[in-house]
Amino acid sequence: MEVERCWTFREGMKHWNVCVQYWLAVNVYKLFPSKKYRVGRTGATLLCSAYWHGFRPGHYFCIMGAPFYVSLEDMWNKLVRKDATGPVRTVIDVLFWIFKWFAFSYLGVAFLLSSFGNIWRFYSSVYHIGYICWAAMMGLGFILTNQRKAAERRRQKRAAGGDTAAVEEKKAQ
């Protein structure tokens, strides 16, 4: 039931098949050699999960698509959701919820169709819209993140420059 109520894909994954998720977290994610690369740890964990499900291409399309979507969701969470409050936060939460279900559905279709030919035929029939949208959102997210970081650096530079000017002004007096 928690899968339906949570707002994000990441939360949904945590509530999906909790016993298996716990085993994967303890035995793969936490034991991954490099703690520095979160996407690598997540990818290795989901690769193990895909292997456990079997050797059908659909399992890999579905399960290995998740780390890319989670990193996209994390980026947009930092950009728009984290600091939002009130009705704006509610609207953003609803959008995240809709996108979560779109991602689950889009990736889940690959799991169900199973063979590469069926998956390719279906994704082609919808013009690979999920992957195209995700790539566009990732690109836009990178641009906005870089702009935000550049604005923060300018703000810090001005603040540091303003402090230096104030110190020099006091010395002159």
List the predicted regions and their residue ranges.
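Non-catalytic, membrane-anchoring transmembrane segments at the edges
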Residues: M1-Q173
